[in-house]
Amino acid sequence: MTVTRFAPSPTGYLHIGGLRTALFSWLTARHNNGKFLLRIEDTDMARNSEEAKDAILKAFEWVGMSHDGEVVYQSKRFDLYKKYIDQLLEEGKAYKCYMTKEELNALREEQMAKKERTRYDGRYRDFTGTPPEGVKPVIRIKAPQEGTISFVDGVKGAMNIAANEVDDFIIARSDGTPTYNFVVAIDDALMGLTDVIRGDDHLYNTPKQIVVYNALGFSIPNFYHVAMINNEQGKKLSKRDGATDVMEYKALGFLPEALLNFLVRLGWSHGDQEIFSVEEMIEQFDPKDINKSASNYNLDKLLWLNAHYIKNKSNSELAELLKEFGVDISEHDKLEMLLDATKERGKTLVELAEQIKLILTAPTDYDEKAVKKAFKGEAKEILTDFIAMLQTWEKPLHLPVDYHEVMEKIVAEKEIGFGKIGMPLRVSLLGSMTGAGMDEVMAIIGVDETIERIERAVSTIA
């Protein structure tokens, strides 16, 4: 059975790079009817944040990426790690190192002066003498001193690292707490991981973890190291570019399905297809198809995808989602008409909410540039005649087509172009030159509100 995992540290919020890695892992598990596990790597007690941990869990809930089984917390597994440290000590595969910080710094300076690679020199590897007084030892694992540490990375290909490139690294600090590469290898092995998908910033942790796997007799999983996400200029993605908390995307009005669709295409493709439902992602995703090169973040692409998913949402779903953005139209008698008129105009739920507010709230002032363009020449006379026509119209005025007929009549009677009524009418009803179609707006707000808004606008025209 395929078993994958995502293992964030609750020292900060979940960013989109992490979410993409989690998505690739989740899709791999779901594609193979396997398990996707979630592990919280909370061993850094000084930097851990309960708020960050909760935000990570909320982000997973928001995007709908469910995990299997209970969340594993490393902070609750210290006794387990100690058991394996003791085992390695007893088997002679690890040892106590009494080297002080001062000695280690002196060694590094000496190596740097000789232009050698800085590394621990193994001086306590076979030490049998009397330990120095007053020094709390660290525990180091015995790394192989010759040969090659090899593995095949599913993205990068064959990786061969000379054994002497990996020194006897620390697996337990002087206070007894275990180190990152040690606990990650143990957890991945005990959780039954078959495939480890992670950012390629972890690529050079892998040889150390393989040393731990081999020392403890664990099976080595398949590794996939995914290239980073860059900004549009090909440089490291920053918060300004979009490397922000996943939940910030929710606050900005992005839909989870749009964000997942966007992220799956950052480093993976399936022909020329751009739009993927979650079901299609699960069906088609294979980690072997992950690109070797870094992907560039493109906000316009994300906005395009988000607009697509908004447009294809049912009106009832959109009405529910809009409540979080200060717009409750769930009981509005023109809900369908209102959303049909606006949902193709909003690239985010925030924009959609603003479009709806623009229609439902009478303008208290008018855009200055729009006024100069629209409220000139015959505008006052045309609007006044339009009010009179609405007041004396004998047919029902309910649908956009009904109001369009009134507009057609005034255009015909006054022998003017549609722009002569359209522009001043738009500014009168919405306060600006942008927004939904005028016939739709009038049908939504009704004839009385339409007349009231036009009269208010006419009173401001000199």
UniProtKB/Swiss-Prot annotation:
Record's protein name: Glutamate--tRNA ligase 1
Keyword terms of this UniProt record: Aminoacyl-tRNA synthetase, ATP-binding, Cytoplasm, Ligase, Nucleotide-binding, Protein biosynthesis
Taxonomic path: Bacteria, Pseudomonadati, Campylobacterota, Epsilonproteobacteria, Campylobacterales
CDD domains, A to Z: GluRS_core
EC code(s) of this entry: 6.1.1.17
Motif position, 'HIGH' region: 8-18
Species the sequence originates in: Sulfurovum sp. (strain NBC37-1)
Binding locations of ATP: 239
Motif 'KMSKS' region mapped to chain: 236-240
Gene: gltX1
EC main group: ligase
UniProt cross-references to HAMAP family, sorted A to Z: Glu_tRNA_synth_type1
